[in-house]
UniProtKB/Swiss-Prot annotation:
Other comment: The porphobilinogen subunits are added to the dipyrromethane group.
Entry's EC annotation: 2.5.1.61
Biological classification of the source: Bacteria, Bacillati, Bacillota, Bacilli, Bacillales
Protein's recorded name: Porphobilinogen deaminase
UniProt organism field: Bacillus thuringiensis subsp. konkukian (strain 97-27)
Cofactors, names only: dipyrromethane
Keywords: Porphyrin biosynthesis, Transferase
Residue(s) carrying S-(dipyrrolylmethanemethyl)cysteine: 241
Length: 309
């Protein structure tokens, strides 16, 4: 019986997601054992600055990918939105389980909705994507950076001077906290989700054919197609955490992919948005990127990157 070593970050959410996925594999009743190996990533250690200033997306996966390449672990369970657009040679996303709610969750101290927040209220987020879109809707708000895992951020909302914070609905759902803490779900038209938000990425080595066969049982074809379109868009624009960038795709009734893609200025004064429909994930992602580039997306990305230096 093969023992599969599964790498995970040490946070409660990461371990919850990892154990949930292992349970799906165990339920198949196939002859495998599983062991979780906890790995500390740079993103878990550096909590005093925003992600955009310390290297963006790769912060939560680099150490785990190193463990995959050196065969310390066999696979890893990531939040798809933490995955860089390009993976190291020899690694691949071997499985995308069914996506859960991709929306952002608005959590206010007083119970006021986003529209009801007092003028000048303090909104906590560490995401340029969220801050740009929400400032576009409410330029009167003040954005104050907030870092840490879910429970840390919820505690900071209670104890510090934040009036509201924004978190991913999916993480709260996976922790079983969504009903008790979420004030409202932000509609995708108000705040387009991050690329891959609500989805998991199961990363493994390309040459591990045995494991890839096992993972195929849990793969969700719709999630795989829609997230692929989002990630092609992200790759073409070379967007990471340093830029207000968003992309969310769904499947239409005719089985086509509909991708809404967005790039914004840091302060939300400019939001470029395009919706593309098509059947091929790669073509849809590239078309969305090309349309936004024609609108001036590259200039916004350059300006955002300069602002981070």
């Amino acid at each position: 019986m093969r023992k599969i070593i599964v790498g995970s970050r040490k946070s409660k959410l990461a371990l919850t997601q990892t154990n949930w996925f292992i349970d799906q594999l165990k339920a198949l009743g196939l002859p495998y054992e599983f062991e979780v190996k906890e790995i500390v990533t740079k993103g878990d250690v550096i909590l005093d600055v925003t992600l955009s200033k310390v290297g963006g997306k790769g912060l939560f996966v680099k150490e785990i990918e190193h463990a995959l390449l050196t065969k310390e672990i066999d696979m890893a369970v990531h939040s798809m939105k933490d995955m860089p657009a390009v993976l190291p040679e020899g690694l691949m996303i071997g499985c995308t389980p069914k996506r859960v709610d991709p929306r952002d969750a608005f959590i206010s101290k007083s119970g006021a909705s986003f529209k009801e927040l007092a003028e000048g209220a303090i909104l906590g987020t560490s995401s340029l994507r969220r801050s740009a879109q929400l400032l576009a809707a409410r330029p009167d708000l003040q954005v104050k950076w907030i870092r840490g895992n879910i429970d840390t951020r919820l505690r900071k909302l209670k104890e510090e001077d934040y009036d509201a914070i924004i978190l991913a609905t999916a993480g709260l759902q996976r922790m079983g906290w969504d009903d008790e803490v979420i004030t409202e779900h932000l509609d995708e038209t108000l705040c387009v989700p991050a690329v891959g938000q609500g989805a998991l990425a199961i990363e493994c080595r390309e040459d591990d054919k045995d494991l890839l066969q096992l993972l195929a049982h849990i793969n969700d074809a719709v999630t795989e197609r829609t997230v692929a379109a989002e990630r092609v868009f992200l790759h073409k624009l070379e967007g990471g955490c340093q830029v207000p960038i968003a992309g969310y795709a769904t499947l239409t009734e005719n089985d086509a992919i509909e991708l809404t893609a967005l790039v914004g200025s840091m302060d939300g004064s400019i939001l470029l948005k395009e919706t593309v429909v098509g059947t091929d994930p790669e073509k849809v992602g590239l078309e969305a990127a090309d349309r936004l580039i024609k609108q001036g997306a590259k200039e916004l990305i350059l300006a955002a990157n300069k602002g981070q230096q």
